[in-house]
Amino acid sequence: MRRILVTSALPYANGHIHLGHLVEYIQTDIWVRFHKLRGEECIYMCADDTHGTPIMLRAQKEGITPEQLVNQMHKEHAQDFAAFFVQFDEYYTTNSEENRLLSEEIYLKNRDGGHIEVDTIQQAYCEHDAMFLPDRFIRGTCPHCGAVDQYGDSCEVCSATYRPTELKEAKCAVCGSQPVEKSSEHYFFKLQDFSDYLKEWIQSGTLQPEMAAKLNEWFEQGLKHWDISRDGPYFGFEIPDAPGKYFYVWLDAPTGYMATTWHHCKKQGINFDDYWRRDDKAEVYHFIGKDILYFHTLFWPAMLHGSGFRTPTAVFAHGFLTVNGQKMSKSRGTFINARQYSAFLNPEYLRYYYAAKLTSRVDDLDLNLDDFVQRVNSDLVGKVVNLASRTAGFIVKRFEGQLCADYPEDDGLFQQFHQAGEEIAALYEKREFAKAMQAIMRLADSANQYVENHAPWVLAKDPLQSQRLQQVCSVTLNLFRTLMIFLKPVLPYMSNQVEQLFNAPQPFVWQDTAAPLQGVTINAFKHLMSRVEKEKVDAMVEAAREEAPSPTPQPKQQTKEKEEKNKKSADKDALAASIDFDTFMQVDLRVARIADAHEVEGADKLLQLTLDLGETLGTRTVFAGIKSSYSAEQLKGRLTVVVANLAPRKMKFGISEGMVLAAGPGGTDIHILSPDSGAQPGQRIK
């Protein structure tokens, strides 16, 4: 039996859980539930990330202590996760004695190993607020890509990390005043000491290929010292040999994975060392967002290695959530938090929809609300629940709830379902949830075809067909039960209801798909899932929009400039001259996956894209003038639309073998077109 420890990134105790966060927690929870369903020893650890200046300042603003604030947020987060059936084996806090002791141990062992350096630095200081400004309380322009309104430690657009003093046009995020530079003694982790070790670790299969490639870029730039200290006042752990200095939150936050495990082990009588002080007793997996890759795949394994702890077996990164093809937006009502969603809709709708779109890659996931309604209604209500709702009533009313004592002839369907289980299990294991859902729905289609072919509603009208009616319904319900076992990691609540329907003496396990139920008495069928109502989705969006703050009025000059810009663009947006159908059909539009993207040296607007057009058409190189709106990293793995038969064009930087389609007036307002989920590279757009 495998022993598996799984973590999700720790939610910060300064805000609500929203649908973007839930991508990761639902993805992780599905993976954990799958392993438990298979009989593996798998524990899921998480905690609130509680330290840092934002917590301290918010608590001051609300007139409470930081401890009171994080305790309040802990309760709220736990309730939100429970509402979406995210089931942690331990949900703890980084503001714990276990975390303090482990953080100190990691620091002291690295210090004693010569991996800590003390240096005097120039640091941003707000004279108005009389405090050194932490990274996240400085906003400005990224020194690498020029993106505006970025944090003082890392850029959300290009993922670069830097020191706050490197930020251009910096301002205090609290009061808006321009900070001054002031010297301060800080403690640095010598990351470059672990360069060789990290290169080997990264290439050992611990990361997805695209993430390993991204890390290679940072090695090419050279690893830098990492500032692990912050000046007081600060809510966090004081550094043992440095009064008035505190551990930076990114040192004690990942240590929270270990502290939560330790807390859990003490409660359960389990050996903590088997998980974190040796690597031959258990597997350790981290699920994270791609925006925190740097911390989890460079700093974290280096700190662990330097202090004698084991490193993760693998780190799985996922992309961001978009809604209707765009970033979550409060003004559009698509920045939806967990409580807003659950007030209107069944959380298992979202669990299934995310599962139906999640892959093992680092692709962004789009929550298309129209597709959401259609897919949930079609797949779960129309294909899965429909099997039980059409047949269970006949068994209860006509046969006192009893399935056939001997499983009937079913043309090999049950065996086919059982054999498909290994393929589905392999897809779950590899985090190819979308493919797993597709495989399950193909089975559901087969089961529904069986029902259509044998028409139990017709058999019920003929007294001479009573035995055949029981047989058809028994087969259908057994197929339904198998489908629900396959779906149990995704739909735990509905699976529990189905267990009650079948009078299951124990919760379903994966091995239950091996044999059909015979002679079992089932309970009366109870409604399992309603259709998604578009009206409720619209009401949810409207409620989220109403809670969004009113837009800040623009100065008259800015408004005038915007009007002039819109007027100039009107001519560009005028309808082009008509063409006939045959002319249009000469344009060969294809689905393409952006396999790679990088900046073009010497070009201000261009990105070089490597497009995958499937096995037949292979790859193409295309230069696209979209650099002002997208970083190269944002594009990797995305699907787009390309004009595939455009004649190659020789450019200064190389030959462009096509054109990707985009909308927008230009500048920073460019949006590449993406096909809906399910489209495959190379498919022609008609």
Curated annotation (Swiss-Prot):
EC number(s) recorded for this UniProt protein: 6.1.1.10
tRNA-binding domain: residues covered: 583-686
InterPro entries assigned: aa-tRNA-synth_I_CS, Anticodon_Met, M/V/L/I-tRNA-synth_anticd-bd, Met-tRNA-synth_bsu_C, Met-tRNA_ligase_1, Met-tRNA_synth, Methionyl/Leucyl_tRNA_Synth, MetRS_core
Motif ('KMSKS' region): 327-331
Cofactor list: Zn(2+)
Pfam families reported for this sequence: Anticodon_1, tRNA-synt_1g, tRNA_bind
Keywords for this protein: Aminoacyl-tRNA synthetase, ATP-binding, Cytoplasm, Ligase, Metal-binding, Nucleotide-binding, Protein biosynthesis, RNA-binding, tRNA-binding, Zinc
Signal peptide limits: none
Free-text remark on how the cofactor is bound: Binds 1 zinc ion per subunit.
Residues bound to ATP: 330
Residue ranges, compositional bias (Basic and acidic residues): 558-572
MF terms (GO), sorted A to Z: ATP binding; metal ion binding; methionine-tRNA ligase activity; tRNA binding
Gene Ontology biological process terms from the UniProt entry: methionyl-tRNA aminoacylation
Catalytic activities: tRNA(Met) + L-methionine + ATP = L-methionyl-tRNA(Met) + AMP + diphosphate
Region: Disordered, residue numbers: 543-572
Binding site for Zn(2+): 142, 145, 155, 158
Known function: Is required not only for elongation of protein synthesis but also for the initiation of all mRNA translation through initiator tRNA(fMet) aminoacylation.
Family per similarity comment: Belongs to the class-I aminoacyl-tRNA synthetase family. MetG type 1 subfamily.
Assembly: Homodimer.
Designated name of the protein: Methionine--tRNA ligase
Species per Swiss-Prot/TrEMBL record: Magnetococcus marinus (strain ATCC BAA-1437 / JCM 17883 / MC-1)
